[in-house]
């Protein structure tokens, strides 16, 4: 198939071009094809932190429900996702790994680019919406079992670097997948020790961590000094637009836009469950019963529109949803950009950034 007269996103900018592809991209600047009438042609979005949508959650959905979830992602511009679990019990976590292990993309579905374990090695004080009774100290044996059960799909683990044994855990776990620091009370020195041990990312920056302070910069300051990649929820509820712009200016191409979406995404306001905990969604804002902000009900397509409306250039917003996350999970050789030989995961967007 060929698409012509598109504004193609390559090398961080848009250029008028055409593309020929089947499962993979075969050529650019070809003759003929479907006229895109100047629409934007961008790589498919990659969401490395999403728990679920349309009633399904990675922590408890059945294997036969994953395709429906993957279909929702694709319908909202996400062509690759990391199946993200919560802090749940070991048996439930093992079952989640088995459920995703056998998933294979079919038709109009997103690809599972890997698994993101959000916990269970997190701080009790900064657990956010993670269930307290399932929090554990770092356990390499458990980590290795989950990696094996996932069929080698483990790409990220979120953990708190201040826990007993965390530095040694990070040193070993980072040989298997990316270690992201989050849900943590860590001060600057402790966070830096985590990065020096091998951590490379920070999970949903500003949320579930100590704030940036001029006398104690905490994880946020450590992430900046370490050159770490940082996730950011851009639903307009978790982070103020001015702070999103500040993160963009500070971290540049290290910023990764995520949804942190829950099973309520794509559904109406109401009462839902989050890994065994009741949550309430009102005006799109998901909270525990005590008012603690949980994940989001958003998606990356909406968040693209959000950040562009906040003043971030479209080229850089697309980078934060494609190139940056692909590099973060060591998958840039296959996905994340439009290049000959890479997967033909592409989106056509109109001037209002709607899917065409």
What are these regions (language model features)?
Residues 1-42:
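Histidine-rich, glycine-flanked metal-binding segment
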Residues 38, 49, 117, 173, ...:
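Conserved, mostly hydrophobic/aromatic
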Residues 51, 67-96, 110-123, 150-162, ...:
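Divalent metal-dependent hydrolysis catalytic cores, especially in the metallo-beta-lactamase
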Residues 96-118, 125-188:
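Metal-dependent enolase-superfamily TIM-barrel catalytic cores that perform enediolate-based chemistry
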Residues 148-267:
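Active-site core of metal-dependent hydrolases
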């Amino acid at each position: 198939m060929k698409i012509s007269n598109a504004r193609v996103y390559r090398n961080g900018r848009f250029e008028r071009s055409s593309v020929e592809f089947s499962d993979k991209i075969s050529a650019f600047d070809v003759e003929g094809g479907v006229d895109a009438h100047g629409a934007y042609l961008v790589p498919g979005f990659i969401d490395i932190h999403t728990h679920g949508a349309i009633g399904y959650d990675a922590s408890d959905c059945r294997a036969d429900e994953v395709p429906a979830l993957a279909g929702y992602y694709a319908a909202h511009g996400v062509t690759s996702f990391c199946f993200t679990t919560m802090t749940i019990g070991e048996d439930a976590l093992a079952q989640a790994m088995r459920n995703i292990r056998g998933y294979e993309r079919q038709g109009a579905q997103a690809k599972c680019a890997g698994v993101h374990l959000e916990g269970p090695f997190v701080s009790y004080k900064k657990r956010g919406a993670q269930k307290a009774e399932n929090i554990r100290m770092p356990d390499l044996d458990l980590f290795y079992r989950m990696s094996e059960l996932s069929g080698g799909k483990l790409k990220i683990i979120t953990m708190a670097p201040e826990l007993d044994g965390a530095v040694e855990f990070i040193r070993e776990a980072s040989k298997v997948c990316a270690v992201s620091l989050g849900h943590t009370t860590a001060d600057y020195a402790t966070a830096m020790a985590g990065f020096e041990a091998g951590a490379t990312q920070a999970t949903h920056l500003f949320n579930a961590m100590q704030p940036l302070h001029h006398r104690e910069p905490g994880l946020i300051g450590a992430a900046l000094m370490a050159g770490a990649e940082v996730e950011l929820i851009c639903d307009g509820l978790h982070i103020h637009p001015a702070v999103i712009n500040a993160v963009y200016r500070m971290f540049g191409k290290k910023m990764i836009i995520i949804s942190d979406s829950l099973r309520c995404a794509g559904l109406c306001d109401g009462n839902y469950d989050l890994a065994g905990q009741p949550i309430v969604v009102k005006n799109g804002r998901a909270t525990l019963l005590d008012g603690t902000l949980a994940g989001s009900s958003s998606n990356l397509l909406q968040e693209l529109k959000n950040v562009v409306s906040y003043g971030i250039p479209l080229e850089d917003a697309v980078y934060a949803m494609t190139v940056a996350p692909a590099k973060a999970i060591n998958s840039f050789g296959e996905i994340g950009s439009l290049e000959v030989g890479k997967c033909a995961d592409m989106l056509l967007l109109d001037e209002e950034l709607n899917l065409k």
